[in-house]
Amino acid sequence: MSSGLIYISLEVLVACLITALVMYYVMKKIYYARGQATLKSASAKAKLMEFQAKSFVEAEEIRMKSQECKLQQQYENKNLQLQTHFDKKEAHLKHLEAQHKEFVRDEKRYLEKEKKELEKERQILEQEKENFKKQRAVCKESQAKALDAMLNYMAYTKDEIKSMILEQLEEELEAQKSALIRRYEKEAKEEGKKKSYAILAEATARFAGNYAAENLTTRIALPCSDYIGRVIGKDGKNIEAFKKVSGVDIEFSEDSSELCLSSFNLYRREVASETLKILIEDGRIQPNRIEEVYHRVARNLEKELLSEGESVVLELELGAMEDELKILIGKMRYRSSFGQNALQHSKEVALLAGLIAEQLGGDKKLARRAGILHDIGKALTQELGRDHVNLGVEVCKRHKEDPVVINAIYAHHGHEEILSVECASVCAADALSAGRPGARRKSDEEYAKRMQALEEIALEFDGVEKAYAMESGRELRVIVKSNQVRDNQVPIIARKIAKKIEESAQYVGEVGVQVVRESRFKTTATLKQ
Protein backbone atom coordinates (compact mmCIF):
# COMPACT_ATOMS: atom_id res chain seq x y z
CA MET A 1 0.00 0.00 0.00
CA SER A 2 2.71 2.36 0.95
CA SER A 3 4.86 1.45 -2.09
CA GLY A 4 1.90 2.25 -4.36
CA LEU A 5 1.52 5.69 -2.80
CA ILE A 6 5.20 6.38 -3.21
CA TYR A 7 5.02 5.45 -6.87
CA ILE A 8 2.07 7.74 -7.50
CA SER A 9 3.87 10.62 -5.73
CA LEU A 10 6.94 10.16 -7.89
CA GLU A 11 4.86 10.24 -11.03
CA VAL A 12 3.18 13.45 -9.91
CA LEU A 13 6.52 14.99 -9.02
CA VAL A 14 8.01 14.03 -12.40
CA ALA A 15 4.98 15.47 -14.17
CA CYS A 16 5.31 18.74 -12.25
CA LEU A 17 8.98 19.02 -13.08
CA ILE A 18 8.34 18.39 -16.76
CA THR A 19 5.54 20.97 -16.74
CA ALA A 20 7.80 23.52 -15.01
CA LEU A 21 10.56 22.96 -17.53
CA VAL A 22 8.18 23.34 -20.43
CA MET A 23 6.75 26.56 -18.91
CA TYR A 24 10.25 27.93 -18.31
CA TYR A 25 11.27 27.24 -21.88
CA VAL A 26 8.08 28.80 -23.28
CA MET A 27 8.38 31.94 -21.09
CA LYS A 28 12.03 32.29 -22.01
CA LYS A 29 11.16 32.23 -25.68
CA ILE A 30 8.39 34.79 -25.14
CA TYR A 31 10.58 37.22 -23.12
CA TYR A 32 13.44 36.79 -25.57
CA ALA A 33 11.18 37.67 -28.46
CA ARG A 34 9.83 40.69 -26.57
CA GLY A 35 13.39 41.81 -25.66
CA GLN A 36 14.48 41.54 -29.25
CA ALA A 37 11.49 43.61 -30.36
CA THR A 38 12.14 46.25 -27.67
CA LEU A 39 15.81 46.36 -28.60
CA LYS A 40 14.99 46.84 -32.25
CA SER A 41 12.49 49.60 -31.38
CA ALA A 42 15.01 51.36 -29.12
CA SER A 43 17.67 51.08 -31.78
CA ALA A 44 15.33 52.63 -34.33
CA LYS A 45 14.44 55.47 -31.94
CA ALA A 46 18.13 56.05 -31.21
CA LYS A 47 18.92 56.24 -34.88
CA LEU A 48 16.00 58.65 -35.39
CA MET A 49 17.18 60.87 -32.52
CA GLU A 50 20.71 60.77 -33.87
CA PHE A 51 19.44 61.84 -37.26
CA GLN A 52 17.35 64.64 -35.73
CA ALA A 53 20.33 65.81 -33.64
CA LYS A 54 22.57 65.89 -36.67
CA SER A 55 19.93 67.82 -38.60
CA PHE A 56 19.54 70.32 -35.72
CA VAL A 57 23.31 70.80 -35.42
CA GLU A 58 23.63 71.36 -39.14
CA ALA A 59 20.75 73.86 -39.07
CA GLU A 60 22.31 75.70 -36.09
CA GLU A 61 25.67 75.81 -37.85
CA ILE A 62 24.02 77.32 -40.89
CA ARG A 63 22.14 79.87 -38.69
CA MET A 64 25.28 80.77 -36.73
CA LYS A 65 27.24 81.31 -39.93
CA SER A 66 24.45 83.52 -41.24
CA GLN A 67 24.36 85.47 -37.95
CA GLU A 68 28.13 85.80 -37.98
CA CYS A 69 28.07 87.19 -41.50
CA LYS A 70 25.33 89.63 -40.50
CA LEU A 71 27.25 90.82 -37.40
CA GLN A 72 30.42 91.14 -39.44
CA GLN A 73 28.58 93.34 -41.93
CA GLN A 74 27.10 95.47 -39.10
CA TYR A 75 30.52 95.84 -37.49
CA GLU A 76 32.07 96.97 -40.74
CA ASN A 77 29.24 99.48 -41.32
CA LYS A 78 29.50 100.86 -37.76
CA ASN A 79 33.27 101.07 -38.00
CA LEU A 80 32.91 102.97 -41.26
CA GLN A 81 30.44 105.40 -39.66
CA LEU A 82 32.70 106.00 -36.66
CA GLN A 83 35.70 106.54 -38.86
CA THR A 84 33.76 109.05 -40.95
CA HIS A 85 32.55 110.86 -37.81
CA PHE A 86 36.08 110.88 -36.37
CA ASP A 87 37.49 112.34 -39.57
CA LYS A 88 34.86 115.11 -39.52
CA LYS A 89 35.58 115.92 -35.86
CA GLU A 90 39.29 115.95 -36.47
CA ALA A 91 38.86 118.31 -39.41
CA HIS A 92 36.59 120.57 -37.31
CA LEU A 93 39.08 120.67 -34.42
CA LYS A 94 41.92 121.53 -36.79
CA HIS A 95 39.80 124.35 -38.19
CA LEU A 96 39.06 125.64 -34.66
CA GLU A 97 42.72 125.41 -33.73
CA ALA A 98 43.65 127.46 -36.76
CA GLN A 99 41.01 130.06 -35.90
CA HIS A 100 42.24 130.21 -32.29
CA LYS A 101 45.83 130.74 -33.39
CA GLU A 102 44.70 133.53 -35.70
CA PHE A 103 42.69 135.10 -32.85
CA VAL A 104 45.69 134.93 -30.50
CA ARG A 105 47.87 136.63 -33.09
CA ASP A 106 45.26 139.38 -33.58
CA GLU A 107 44.92 139.88 -29.81
CA LYS A 108 48.66 140.07 -29.41
CA ARG A 109 48.92 142.73 -32.11
CA TYR A 110 46.04 144.68 -30.52
CA LEU A 111 47.62 144.53 -27.04
CA GLU A 112 50.95 145.71 -28.35
CA LYS A 113 49.19 148.62 -30.04
CA GLU A 114 47.29 149.47 -26.83
CA LYS A 115 50.49 149.27 -24.83
CA LYS A 116 52.16 151.79 -27.11
CA GLU A 117 49.18 154.16 -26.87
CA LEU A 118 49.11 153.86 -23.05
CA GLU A 119 52.80 154.61 -22.90
CA LYS A 120 52.21 157.76 -24.95
CA GLU A 121 49.34 158.81 -22.65
CA ARG A 122 51.50 158.15 -19.58
CA GLN A 123 54.22 160.38 -20.94
CA ILE A 124 51.63 163.10 -21.67
CA LEU A 125 50.24 162.81 -18.10
CA GLU A 126 53.72 163.01 -16.63
CA GLN A 127 54.31 166.17 -18.61
CA GLU A 128 50.98 167.64 -17.49
CA LYS A 129 51.79 166.70 -13.89
CA GLU A 130 55.06 168.58 -14.09
CA ASN A 131 53.28 171.58 -15.60
CA PHE A 132 50.65 171.45 -12.82
CA LYS A 133 53.33 171.40 -10.14
CA LYS A 134 54.97 174.43 -11.71
CA GLN A 135 51.64 176.29 -11.97
CA ARG A 136 50.80 175.37 -8.36
CA ALA A 137 54.12 176.72 -7.18
CA VAL A 138 53.49 179.92 -9.13
CA CYS A 139 49.97 180.22 -7.57
CA LYS A 140 51.32 179.72 -4.06
CA GLU A 141 53.95 182.34 -4.68
CA SER A 142 51.29 184.73 -6.02
CA GLN A 143 49.00 184.03 -3.02
CA ALA A 144 51.85 184.68 -0.62
CA LYS A 145 52.65 187.98 -2.35
CA ALA A 146 48.95 188.97 -2.34
CA LEU A 147 48.60 188.05 1.33
CA ASP A 148 51.70 190.03 2.25
CA ALA A 149 50.34 192.99 0.32
CA MET A 150 46.97 192.73 2.16
CA LEU A 151 48.66 192.45 5.54
CA ASN A 152 50.57 195.64 4.85
CA TYR A 153 47.24 197.53 4.57
CA MET A 154 45.44 195.74 7.51
CA ALA A 155 45.79 195.90 11.28
CA TYR A 156 45.73 192.08 11.78
CA THR A 157 48.53 189.59 11.64
CA LYS A 158 48.49 186.43 9.59
CA ASP A 159 47.79 184.21 12.62
CA GLU A 160 44.94 186.46 13.79
CA ILE A 161 43.24 186.27 10.40
CA LYS A 162 43.58 182.45 10.45
CA SER A 163 42.04 182.32 13.93
CA MET A 164 39.10 184.51 12.86
CA ILE A 165 38.42 182.34 9.81
CA LEU A 166 38.67 179.12 11.85
CA GLU A 167 36.30 180.46 14.53
CA GLN A 168 33.74 181.42 11.91
CA LEU A 169 34.02 177.98 10.25
CA GLU A 170 33.75 176.28 13.64
CA GLU A 171 30.50 178.14 14.44
CA GLU A 172 29.02 177.26 11.06
CA LEU A 173 30.02 173.59 11.41
CA GLU A 174 28.63 173.45 14.96
CA ALA A 175 25.25 174.75 13.75
CA GLN A 176 25.21 172.28 10.87
CA LYS A 177 26.19 169.43 13.20
CA SER A 178 23.42 170.31 15.66
CA ALA A 179 20.82 170.40 12.88
CA LEU A 180 22.02 167.05 11.54
CA ILE A 181 21.94 165.47 15.00
CA ARG A 182 18.38 166.65 15.61
CA ARG A 183 17.28 165.42 12.19
CA TYR A 184 18.92 162.01 12.60
CA GLU A 185 17.52 161.62 16.13
CA LYS A 186 14.02 162.37 14.85
CA GLU A 187 14.41 159.98 11.92
CA ALA A 188 15.81 157.26 14.20
CA LYS A 189 12.93 157.63 16.67
CA GLU A 190 10.34 157.54 13.91
CA GLU A 191 11.99 154.55 12.25
CA GLY A 192 12.34 152.72 15.57
CA LYS A 193 8.71 153.40 16.40
CA LYS A 194 7.54 152.11 13.01
CA LYS A 195 9.76 149.04 13.31
CA SER A 196 8.55 148.24 16.83
CA TYR A 197 4.91 148.64 15.78
CA ALA A 198 5.50 146.35 12.81
CA ILE A 199 7.16 143.69 14.96
CA LEU A 200 4.41 143.80 17.60
CA ALA A 201 1.70 143.75 14.93
CA GLU A 202 3.22 140.73 13.20
CA ALA A 203 3.75 138.90 16.50
CA THR A 204 0.17 139.46 17.66
CA ALA A 205 -1.20 138.61 14.21
CA ARG A 206 0.67 135.28 14.17
CA PHE A 207 -0.53 134.39 17.67
CA ALA A 208 -4.14 134.13 18.77
CA GLY A 209 -4.45 132.69 22.26
CA ASN A 210 -7.33 132.18 24.61
CA TYR A 211 -7.33 133.38 28.17
CA ALA A 212 -9.24 132.10 31.16
CA ALA A 213 -10.92 134.40 33.62
CA GLU A 214 -10.93 132.78 37.05
CA ASN A 215 -13.69 133.13 39.64
CA LEU A 216 -13.27 132.78 43.37
CA THR A 217 -16.03 130.15 43.69
CA THR A 218 -16.77 126.66 42.40
CA ARG A 219 -20.28 125.24 42.25
CA ILE A 220 -21.09 121.51 42.63
CA ALA A 221 -24.53 120.13 41.80
CA LEU A 222 -26.18 117.79 44.33
CA PRO A 223 -28.17 114.68 43.25
CA CYS A 224 -30.92 115.59 45.72
CA SER A 225 -31.52 117.79 48.75
CA ASP A 226 -30.87 114.87 51.14
CA TYR A 227 -27.13 115.19 50.46
CA ILE A 228 -26.99 118.48 52.34
CA GLY A 229 -27.56 116.60 55.57
CA ARG A 230 -24.87 114.07 54.67
CA VAL A 231 -22.38 116.80 53.88
CA ILE A 232 -23.11 118.65 57.13
CA GLY A 233 -23.11 115.47 59.20
CA LYS A 234 -24.25 114.90 62.73
CA ASP A 235 -23.74 118.05 64.80
CA GLY A 236 -21.90 119.52 61.79
CA LYS A 237 -18.91 117.18 62.18
CA ASN A 238 -18.54 116.40 58.48
CA ILE A 239 -18.53 119.99 57.28
CA GLU A 240 -16.17 121.07 60.06
CA ALA A 241 -13.78 118.23 59.19
CA PHE A 242 -13.94 119.22 55.52
CA LYS A 243 -13.20 122.89 56.27
CA LYS A 244 -10.38 121.91 58.60
CA VAL A 245 -8.59 119.64 56.13
CA SER A 246 -9.19 121.73 53.00
CA GLY A 247 -9.27 125.33 54.25
CA VAL A 248 -12.20 126.04 51.90
CA ASP A 249 -15.57 127.54 52.84
CA ILE A 250 -18.84 125.78 51.87
CA GLU A 251 -22.14 127.49 51.22
CA PHE A 252 -25.49 125.99 50.20
CA SER A 253 -27.85 127.39 47.58
CA GLU A 254 -31.33 128.48 48.63
CA ASP A 255 -33.02 125.64 46.72
CA SER A 256 -30.57 123.03 48.12
CA SER A 257 -29.58 121.97 44.59
CA GLU A 258 -25.88 122.80 44.73
CA LEU A 259 -22.89 123.59 46.92
CA CYS A 260 -20.61 126.59 46.53
CA LEU A 261 -16.90 126.33 47.45
CA SER A 262 -15.11 129.66 47.93
CA SER A 263 -11.39 130.32 48.34
CA PHE A 264 -8.83 132.72 46.89
CA ASN A 265 -6.43 129.76 46.51
CA LEU A 266 -7.39 128.02 43.24
CA TYR A 267 -5.22 124.98 43.91
CA ARG A 268 -6.72 124.41 47.34
CA ARG A 269 -10.22 124.90 45.92
CA GLU A 270 -9.54 122.40 43.10
CA VAL A 271 -8.47 119.69 45.57
CA ALA A 272 -11.51 120.39 47.75
CA SER A 273 -13.86 120.31 44.76
CA GLU A 274 -12.57 116.93 43.50
CA THR A 275 -12.72 115.53 47.05
CA LEU A 276 -16.32 116.59 47.52
CA LYS A 277 -17.36 115.18 44.13
CA ILE A 278 -15.87 111.76 45.03
CA LEU A 279 -17.54 111.79 48.45
CA ILE A 280 -20.95 112.71 47.00
CA GLU A 281 -20.68 110.03 44.31
CA ASP A 282 -19.58 107.40 46.84
CA GLY A 283 -22.19 108.41 49.43
CA ARG A 284 -19.96 107.63 52.42
CA ILE A 285 -19.27 111.01 53.98
CA GLN A 286 -17.47 110.73 57.33
CA PRO A 287 -14.66 112.74 58.96
CA ASN A 288 -12.07 109.97 58.52
CA ARG A 289 -13.25 109.28 54.98
CA ILE A 290 -13.08 112.98 54.13
CA GLU A 291 -9.44 113.25 55.22
CA GLU A 292 -8.47 110.03 53.41
CA VAL A 293 -10.05 111.08 50.10
CA TYR A 294 -8.63 114.62 50.36
CA HIS A 295 -5.04 113.41 50.75
CA ARG A 296 -5.46 110.90 47.90
CA VAL A 297 -6.82 113.60 45.59
CA ALA A 298 -3.94 115.91 46.60
CA ARG A 299 -1.36 113.24 45.71
CA ASN A 300 -3.01 112.55 42.34
CA LEU A 301 -3.15 116.25 41.58
CA GLU A 302 0.59 116.58 42.33
CA LYS A 303 1.25 113.93 39.67
CA GLU A 304 -1.04 115.79 37.26
CA LEU A 305 0.94 118.98 37.90
CA LEU A 306 4.15 117.33 36.68
CA SER A 307 2.33 115.96 33.64
CA GLU A 308 0.84 119.39 32.95
CA GLY A 309 4.28 121.02 33.18
CA GLU A 310 5.83 118.43 30.87
CA SER A 311 3.06 119.03 28.31
CA VAL A 312 3.73 122.77 28.37
CA VAL A 313 7.50 122.24 27.98
CA LEU A 314 6.92 119.93 25.00
CA GLU A 315 4.36 122.28 23.46
CA LEU A 316 6.78 125.23 23.62
CA GLU A 317 9.79 123.07 22.58
CA LEU A 318 11.91 124.24 25.52
CA GLY A 319 14.16 121.20 25.84
CA ALA A 320 15.31 119.76 29.18
CA MET A 321 13.96 121.26 32.41
CA GLU A 322 14.06 120.25 36.08
CA ASP A 323 11.00 118.44 37.51
CA GLU A 324 10.51 121.07 40.23
CA LEU A 325 10.16 123.78 37.59
CA LYS A 326 7.72 121.60 35.62
CA ILE A 327 5.60 121.08 38.74
CA LEU A 328 5.58 124.83 39.41
CA ILE A 329 4.57 125.48 35.80
CA GLY A 330 1.68 123.05 36.21
CA LYS A 331 0.76 124.66 39.52
CA MET A 332 0.39 128.06 37.84
CA ARG A 333 -2.76 126.63 36.30
CA TYR A 334 -4.29 127.14 39.75
CA ARG A 335 -3.01 130.69 40.19
CA SER A 336 -4.58 133.86 38.84
CA SER A 337 -3.76 137.56 38.78
CA PHE A 338 -6.62 140.06 38.41
CA GLY A 339 -8.78 137.20 37.08
CA GLN A 340 -6.23 136.14 34.42
CA ASN A 341 -5.00 132.55 34.67
CA ALA A 342 -1.25 132.59 35.43
CA LEU A 343 -0.37 129.54 33.30
CA GLN A 344 -2.33 130.77 30.30
CA HIS A 345 -0.73 134.21 30.71
CA SER A 346 2.78 132.70 30.90
CA LYS A 347 2.20 130.53 27.81
CA GLU A 348 0.92 133.56 25.95
CA VAL A 349 3.97 135.59 27.01
CA ALA A 350 6.31 132.75 25.96
CA LEU A 351 4.80 132.45 22.48
CA LEU A 352 4.67 136.22 21.91
CA ALA A 353 8.23 136.67 23.23
CA GLY A 354 9.49 133.96 20.87
CA LEU A 355 7.86 135.65 17.88
CA ILE A 356 9.19 139.10 18.84
CA ALA A 357 12.72 137.81 19.54
CA GLU A 358 12.75 136.02 16.19
CA GLN A 359 11.87 139.29 14.42
CA LEU A 360 14.66 141.10 16.30
CA GLY A 361 17.29 138.46 15.52
CA GLY A 362 17.34 136.97 19.04
CA ASP A 363 17.14 133.41 20.34
CA LYS A 364 13.50 132.31 19.93
CA LYS A 365 13.84 129.23 22.17
CA LEU A 366 15.54 131.17 24.99
CA ALA A 367 12.91 133.92 24.79
CA ARG A 368 10.15 131.31 25.14
CA ARG A 369 11.92 129.76 28.13
CA ALA A 370 12.24 133.15 29.83
CA GLY A 371 8.59 133.89 29.01
CA ILE A 372 7.20 130.72 30.60
CA LEU A 373 9.37 131.23 33.72
CA HIS A 374 8.99 135.01 34.16
CA ASP A 375 6.10 134.57 36.67
CA ILE A 376 7.16 131.16 38.08
CA GLY A 377 7.35 132.67 41.58
CA LYS A 378 3.56 133.14 41.60
CA ALA A 379 3.21 129.38 42.09
CA LEU A 380 4.91 129.79 45.50
CA THR A 381 3.54 133.10 46.80
CA GLN A 382 0.41 131.70 48.44
CA GLU A 383 2.42 129.14 50.41
CA LEU A 384 5.51 131.24 51.24
CA GLY A 385 3.89 134.69 51.31
CA ARG A 386 6.78 136.55 49.66
CA ASP A 387 7.32 138.61 46.53
CA HIS A 388 6.94 136.41 43.44
CA VAL A 389 9.91 138.08 41.70
CA ASN A 390 12.44 137.09 44.37
CA LEU A 391 10.88 133.63 44.74
CA GLY A 392 11.13 133.07 40.99
CA VAL A 393 14.77 134.20 40.90
CA GLU A 394 15.67 131.90 43.81
CA VAL A 395 14.15 128.78 42.27
CA CYS A 396 15.63 129.49 38.81
CA LYS A 397 19.10 130.16 40.25
CA ARG A 398 18.86 126.95 42.25
CA HIS A 399 18.37 125.03 39.02
CA LYS A 400 21.04 127.06 37.15
CA GLU A 401 18.77 128.67 34.57
CA ASP A 402 20.25 130.99 31.93
CA PRO A 403 21.09 134.56 33.11
CA VAL A 404 18.66 135.86 30.47
CA VAL A 405 15.83 134.10 32.35
CA ILE A 406 16.92 135.70 35.64
CA ASN A 407 17.14 139.11 33.98
CA ALA A 408 13.63 138.68 32.51
CA ILE A 409 12.15 137.84 35.93
CA TYR A 410 13.71 140.97 37.43
CA ALA A 411 13.22 143.31 34.47
CA HIS A 412 9.53 142.72 33.74
CA HIS A 413 8.77 144.45 37.06
CA GLY A 414 11.50 147.08 36.70
CA HIS A 415 13.90 145.59 39.28
CA GLU A 416 16.75 145.47 36.73
CA GLU A 417 17.68 147.03 33.42
CA ILE A 418 16.95 145.02 30.26
CA LEU A 419 20.22 143.40 29.14
CA SER A 420 19.26 141.38 26.05
CA VAL A 421 16.90 141.16 23.10
CA GLU A 422 15.23 138.11 24.63
CA CYS A 423 14.57 139.95 27.90
CA ALA A 424 13.12 142.93 26.04
CA SER A 425 10.87 140.54 24.09
CA VAL A 426 9.56 139.02 27.34
CA CYS A 427 8.82 142.45 28.83
CA ALA A 428 6.99 143.54 25.68
CA ALA A 429 5.03 140.27 25.52
CA ASP A 430 4.10 140.57 29.21
CA ALA A 431 2.74 144.07 28.63
CA LEU A 432 0.78 142.87 25.57
CA SER A 433 -0.73 139.90 27.38
CA ALA A 434 -1.62 141.72 30.59
CA GLY A 435 -2.49 145.12 29.17
CA ARG A 436 -5.00 144.36 26.42
CA PRO A 437 -8.64 145.21 27.28
CA GLY A 438 -10.47 142.26 28.81
CA ALA A 439 -7.42 140.15 29.60
CA ARG A 440 -7.54 141.01 33.27
CA ARG A 441 -10.60 141.77 35.34
CA LYS A 442 -11.02 143.87 38.45
CA SER A 443 -14.07 144.46 40.60
CA ASP A 444 -16.76 146.85 39.40
CA GLU A 445 -16.10 149.19 42.31
CA GLU A 446 -12.37 149.42 41.60
CA TYR A 447 -13.08 149.97 37.92
CA ALA A 448 -15.54 152.79 38.66
CA LYS A 449 -13.13 154.46 41.08
CA ARG A 450 -10.38 154.38 38.48
CA MET A 451 -12.61 156.00 35.86
CA GLN A 452 -13.82 158.68 38.29
CA ALA A 453 -10.29 159.46 39.49
CA LEU A 454 -9.11 160.06 35.91
CA GLU A 455 -11.96 162.48 35.24
CA GLU A 456 -11.41 164.33 38.53
CA ILE A 457 -7.73 164.88 37.70
CA ALA A 458 -8.66 166.60 34.43
CA LEU A 459 -11.44 168.70 35.97
CA GLU A 460 -8.99 170.23 38.48
CA PHE A 461 -7.34 172.32 35.75
CA ASP A 462 -8.60 175.80 34.83
CA GLY A 463 -10.48 176.05 31.56
CA VAL A 464 -11.56 172.39 31.50
CA GLU A 465 -15.28 172.06 30.85
CA LYS A 466 -15.79 168.29 30.65
CA ALA A 467 -13.73 165.10 30.92
CA TYR A 468 -14.58 161.56 29.81
CA ALA A 469 -12.62 158.42 30.71
CA MET A 470 -12.89 155.97 27.80
CA GLU A 471 -11.46 152.66 26.47
CA SER A 472 -11.44 151.00 29.91
CA GLY A 473 -9.47 153.90 31.34
CA ARG A 474 -6.79 153.86 28.64
CA GLU A 475 -7.94 157.13 27.11
CA LEU A 476 -8.99 160.43 28.71
CA ARG A 477 -10.85 162.87 26.48
CA VAL A 478 -10.87 166.45 27.82
CA ILE A 479 -13.01 169.29 26.44
CA VAL A 480 -11.80 172.82 27.26
CA LYS A 481 -13.63 176.15 27.11
CA SER A 482 -12.75 177.93 23.89
CA ASN A 483 -13.25 181.38 25.45
CA GLN A 484 -10.69 180.70 28.20
CA VAL A 485 -8.08 178.48 26.50
CA ARG A 486 -6.15 179.45 23.37
CA ASP A 487 -4.91 176.98 20.73
CA ASN A 488 -1.27 177.29 21.82
CA GLN A 489 -2.28 176.38 25.40
CA VAL A 490 -3.89 173.04 24.44
CA PRO A 491 -0.61 171.00 24.27
CA ILE A 492 0.50 172.47 27.61
CA ILE A 493 -2.74 171.44 29.33
CA ALA A 494 -2.51 167.93 27.82
CA ARG A 495 1.04 167.49 29.13
CA LYS A 496 0.12 168.79 32.60
CA ILE A 497 -2.83 166.37 32.85
CA ALA A 498 -0.65 163.45 31.71
CA LYS A 499 2.02 164.32 34.27
CA LYS A 500 -0.60 164.57 37.03
CA ILE A 501 -1.93 161.12 36.10
CA GLU A 502 1.62 159.68 36.19
CA GLU A 503 2.16 161.08 39.69
CA SER A 504 -1.16 159.94 41.18
CA ALA A 505 -1.95 156.64 39.39
CA GLN A 506 -1.39 153.39 41.33
CA TYR A 507 -1.56 150.95 38.40
CA VAL A 508 0.62 149.93 35.46
CA GLY A 509 -0.21 150.89 31.87
CA GLU A 510 -0.65 153.90 29.60
CA VAL A 511 -3.39 156.53 29.46
CA GLY A 512 -3.73 158.63 26.33
CA VAL A 513 -4.80 162.23 27.02
CA GLN A 514 -6.73 163.96 24.23
CA VAL A 515 -7.61 167.66 24.70
CA VAL A 516 -10.28 169.14 22.44
CA ARG A 517 -10.90 172.87 21.91
CA GLU A 518 -13.93 173.73 19.81
CA SER A 519 -15.62 177.03 18.87
CA ARG A 520 -19.23 177.12 17.77
CA PHE A 521 -21.29 180.04 16.43
CA LYS A 522 -25.04 180.00 15.98
CA THR A 523 -27.25 182.37 14.00
CA THR A 524 -30.75 182.30 12.52
CA ALA A 525 -31.84 182.63 8.91
CA THR A 526 -35.31 184.13 8.27
CA LEU A 527 -37.17 182.79 5.25
CA LYS A 528 -39.73 185.01 3.48
CA GLN A 529 -42.33 184.15 0.89
From Swiss-Prot:
Domain HD, residue spans: 342-435
Organism: Helicobacter pylori (strain ATCC 700392 / 26695)
Record localization: Cell membrane
NCBIfam families (alphabetical): HDIG (TIGR00277), RNase_Y (TIGR03319)
Superkingdom of origin organism: Bacteria
CC per GO annotation: plasma membrane
Membrane-spanning ranges: 4-24
Annotated function: Endoribonuclease that initiates mRNA decay.
SUPFAM superfamilies named among the record's database cross-references: Eukaryotic type KH-domain (KH-domain type I), HD-domain/PDEase-like
Keywords from the UniProt entry: Cell membrane, Endonuclease, Hydrolase, Membrane, Nuclease, RNA-binding, Transmembrane, Transmembrane helix
Gene name for this UniProt entry: rny
Alphabetical list of CDD domains matching this protein: HDc (cd00077), KH-I_RNaseY (cd22431)
SMART domains in the cross-refs: HDc, KH
All copies of domain KH, residue ranges: 216-297
Cystine pairings recorded for this chain: none
Main subcellular localisation: membrane
Enzyme Commission (EC) number: 3.1.-.-
Family matches, as InterPro entries: HD/PDEase_dom, HD_domain, HDIG_dom, KH_dom, KH_dom_type_1, KH_dom_type_1_sf, Ribonuclease_Y, RNase_Y_N
Gene Ontology molecular functions: RNA binding; RNA endonuclease activity
GO biological processes: mRNA catabolic process
Family as reported in the entry's similarity comment: Belongs to the RNase Y family.
Entry membrane topology: Single-pass membrane protein
Enzyme kind, highest EC tier: hydrolase
The name this protein goes by in its record: Ribonuclease Y
